[in-house]
Amino acid sequence: MNLLHLDSSILGDHSASRQLTHEVVQAYLTAHADSQVTYRDLASDALGHFSAASLAAAGTPVEVRDAAQQQEVAGNEATLQQFLDSDVLVIGAPMYNFTIPTQLKAWFDRILIAGRTFRYSEAGPEGLCGGKKVIIVSTSGGLHAGQPTGVGHEELLKALFAFIGITDLQFVRAHGLAYGEEPRASAMSAAQHYIQNELFAA
């Protein structure tokens, strides 16, 4: 199995989501020792925002692309292929201002590609990436699950993956991290217990 591990937090070593995605990957490898892991840090090795230049590069014939366009297309294709080659994804998705980090959104903009990960038919859009498993580490300073302020976070992630045919999602949650030392420790401990004892339980 090929596992793609993505972090998107901008907090480096202070990041709760990074700590937990690492623990998820280690727990997965304990259960599936023959798996191959590919790691990508979307914060330190950030993709640019999807732009008019991105569209222009993709639409320009190969033989007349300039160097910048060649680099854009090659990078986007590598990102897409990395996703397509994966069987399992572990994604760190902290909440920033009620939604996912822009670095993670830029990654989605490279993998939601008509004809590659979804297609349009007379019946509407059809996802082409079924069969993949996604584990999302969801962290937030407040408590937004089930609230209007949470729609742009976990619900958005569910919608994005469902659009390309992926419905096998599991969430590891550590919320309320900004409510003080004790609530933070409790949330992290609960998430770690879930990872070690329930996430990959048979």
Swiss-Prot record:
Gene Ontology molecular function: any one: oxidoreductase activity, acting on NAD(P)H, quinone or similar compound as acceptor
Lineage, broadest ranks: Bacteria, Pseudomonadati, Pseudomonadota, Gammaproteobacteria, Pseudomonadales
Gene3D superfamilies named in the record: 3.40.50.360
Keyword annotations: Flavoprotein, FMN, NAD, Oxidoreductase
Reaction equations catalysed: 2 a quinone + NADH + H(+) = 2 a 1,4-benzosemiquinone + NAD(+); N,N-dimethyl-1,4-phenylenediamine + anthranilate + 2 NAD(+) = 2-(4-dimethylaminophenyl)diazenylbenzoate + 2 NADH + 2 H(+)
Gene name of the record: azoR
Cofactor(s) this protein requires: FMN
EC numbers on record: 1.6.5.-, 1.7.1.17
Family: Belongs to the azoreductase type 1 family.
SUPFAM superfamilies cross-referenced by the UniProt entry: Flavoproteins
InterPro entries: Flavodoxin_fold, Flavoprotein-like_sf, FMN-dep_NADH:Q_OxRdtase_AzoR1, NADH:quinone_OxRdtase_FMN_depd
Pfam families on file: Flavodoxin_2 (PF02525)
Name assigned to this protein: FMN-dependent NADH:quinone oxidoreductase
Role played: Quinone reductase that provides resistance to thiol-specific stress caused by electrophilic quinones. Also exhibits azoreductase activity. Catalyzes the reductive cleavage of the azo bond in aromatic azo compounds to the corresponding amines.
Cofactor note: Binds 1 FMN per subunit.
Binding-site positions, FMN: 9, 15-17, 95-98, 139-142
Organism expressing this protein natively: Pseudomonas syringae pv. syringae (strain B728a)
Quaternary organization: Homodimer.
